[in-house]
C-alpha cells in the first residue's frame, strides 16, 4: 500500500483526512529573518558584510531580504570603513555584519573611526552557540567554542551600546535600542553580538516587546513603557546600564 501526505493549512493531511491539528502562526519567524525585516522597516537599505559560519543565519536572512542591498567585501575592516563612509555620504545609517572571533576583531578599526567622528553604525556579529561560550561556562576560561571571542568586552569603549543577545525574546528591544542610540544626540556605533542558537531560534513576533525611548531618556531602562516593574525579559545589565554609554552632562561655561 502506498501512502502519501500533504501539508494543509491546519495540519498534516493524508488522503484528505487531517491526522494532527497544529497551531498555525503567520507571525512566527526565525530571529535572523526578523532582524533583516526589522532593518528594512527602520529604513536601512544597505548592509556591508563578510560571511562566516558564526553568522550563517544572519548572512542568510540579510542576503535574502527584499529591499536590503548587501555588499560583500573581502575584509571586515573594509566593511566597517564602507559603513562609516556610507553614513557620511548618504546621511543615513547602514548595517555591518561579520562573523565571530576574527570577523569582529577585524572590524574594530573602522568602528573606532565611527566612534571618534560620531558616525552612526549598526554592527551585527555572529557568535558561537551560547552554551559553548566561555561566558556561559562560568569558570573563567578565555575561550571554549570554535573561533570564539567575547567581542563585547573589547568594543564597549567605542560603542554607545553593545550586548551579546542571549535571549531570543529580547531581539526587538535590543535592535530598537541599538538603532535609537546610534542615531540620536551624539551619534555613534552600536553593536549586537548574536550567538548561533539565537540567530536560528524562532519567535512569535507579536510577543516581542520594543524599546521605549521616553522611559530611557528619563533615566529608565527602556522597558517601563510596557511593564511597571520586573519585565520578564529584562536583564541585570538593563538596570545597571552596562554595555552602554549614556550622554554625559557637559560642564557649563561661565
Predicted regions and their residues:
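N-terminal alpha/beta PP-like core and its mobile active-site loop of ThDP/TPP-dependent enzymes
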Residues: 21-229
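Extended beta-strand solenoid/passenger and fiber regions
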Residues: 221, 226-254
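Generic low-complexity segments that are intrinsically disordered, proline-rich and/or Lys/Arg-biased
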Residues: 10-11, 190, 214, 232-233, ...
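Short, positively charged and aromatic/hydrophobic N-terminal segments
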Residues: 3, 12, 17-18
